[in-house]
């Protein structure tokens, strides 16, 4: 999209290919969340939890779905109307008004260390002090950030974005359009040891690969270990947050999401379209079927074979947890009732004793 300082609402609508309701000449020069937006901002409403702001916002325009535009049309405000998912159109506006910051190091920096056997594709950017190992392959239009390492025999597809200080060890295979945030480590050895008769632990070599398919995103300081014999696999479209630990020979299906500080132990298989909440712990050698949602801090100790929402430790269906929480909340009242019953029983006991001693 072309970039300039100010757009009319109609110009934005044409760029986004959406409809306008209201004053098409309204000037827009920035983006802001609905609660803070001023007259020169465009904002959006995606979650109805924030609908209370739509009446009071000073935004120059609001991006809404068709259903929302019908619901709030009486407010006499400027709307950009999309078929669904206002947040997607808003993201395009962000890209218009806040262009990405370039590093200032186009091409291959002279301090980068590239093995002579490595293959570097067309239009690749390699920033200062990055290291590309022997027989590594960097696909066209990919970007390797400052101080990052791509190990020997590793493969990166086209249009990958590897931020600074990423470690991609040897024999890692990464698909197209993969984004890896700073500090991530891909292909480290798994946590596998054998303990001898004297109680000493000896590390086992891990010879498998890590395979990252197309359109995967990996957060900052996340670690993905290679398998001992077989590969660790992250399937296409999966998004992984910061500080996630994925152990050896884990397989994660397509278009799943893993939130920060989750940990998945070795040889576990995760299905497609699974959501793993923050700080969730998943034990090893189990499987989780498709379309499972794990709430934050869930402790998964055995396989999950039915889609649905799970939580607690050990993990159990959300409805069961909800019932248990309701009972726990009722404990103070139950304690009060028990106390009252105890007092009544004591009173009855005293009266009974008095009746027995009365001649």
Swiss-Prot record:
Q: What pathway does the annotation place this protein in?
A: Bacterial outer membrane biogenesis; LPS lipid A biosynthesis
Q: From the Swiss-Prot or TrEMBL record, what is one GO molecular function term?
A: N-acyltransferase activity
Is Transmembrane among this UniProt entry's keywords? no
What keywords is this UniProt entry annotated with? Acyltransferase, Lipid A biosynthesis, Lipid biosynthesis, Lipid metabolism, Repeat, Transferase
Q: Which InterPro entries match?
A: Hexapep, LpxD, Trimer_LpxA-like_sf, UDP_GlcNAc_AcTrfase_non-rep
**In which family does this protein belong, per the annotation?**
Belongs to the transferase hexapeptide repeat family. LpxD subfamily.
Assembly and partners are described as: Homotrimer.
Protein known as: UDP-3-O-acylglucosamine N-acyltransferase
């Amino acid at each position: 999209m072309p970039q300039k300082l100010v757009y009319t609402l109609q110009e934005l609508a044409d760029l986004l290919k959406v409809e306008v309701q209201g004053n098409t000449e309204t000037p827009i020069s920035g983006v802001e969340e609905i609660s803070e937006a001023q007259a020169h901002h465009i904002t959006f409403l995606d979650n109805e939890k924030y609908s209370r702001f739509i009446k009071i916002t000073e935004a120059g325009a609001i991006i809404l779905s068709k259903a929302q535009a019908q619901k709030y049309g009486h407010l006499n405000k400027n709307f950009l109307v999309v078929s669904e998912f206002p947040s997607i159109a808003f993201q395009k506006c962000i890209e218009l008004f806040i262009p990405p910051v370039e590093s200032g190091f186009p091409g291959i920096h002279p301090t980068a260390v590239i093995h002579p056997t490595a293959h570097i594709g067309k239009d690749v950017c390699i920033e200062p002090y990055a290291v590309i190992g022997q027989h590594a392959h960097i696909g066209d239009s990919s970007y390797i950030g400052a101080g990052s390492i791509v190990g020997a025999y590793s493969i990166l597809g086209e249009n990958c974005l590897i931020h600074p200080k990423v470690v991609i060890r040897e024999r890692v295979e990464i698909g197209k359009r993969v984004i890896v945030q700073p500090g991530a480590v891909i292909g480290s050895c798994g946590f596998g040891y054998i303990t001898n008769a004297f109680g000493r632990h000896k590390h086992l070599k891990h010879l498998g690969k890590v395979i990252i398919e197309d359109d995967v995103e990996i957060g900052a300081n996340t670690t993905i270990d290679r398998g001992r014999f077989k590969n660790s696999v992250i399937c296409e479209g999966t998004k992984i947050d910061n500080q996630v630990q994925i152990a050896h020979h884990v397989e994660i299906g397509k278009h799943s999401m893993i939130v920060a500080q989750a940990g998945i132990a070795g040889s576990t298989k995760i299905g497609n379209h699974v959501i793993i909440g923050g700080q969730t712990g998943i034990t090893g050698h189990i499987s989780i079927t498709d379309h499972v949602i794990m709430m934050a801090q869930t402790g998964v100790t055995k396989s999950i074979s039915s889609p649905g929402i799970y939580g607690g430790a050990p993990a159990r269906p959300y409805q069961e947890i909800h019932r248990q929480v309701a009972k726990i909340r009722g404990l103070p009242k139950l304690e009060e009732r028990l106390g009252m019953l105890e007092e009544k029983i004591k009173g009855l006991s005293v009266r009974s004793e008095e009746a027995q001693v009365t001649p």
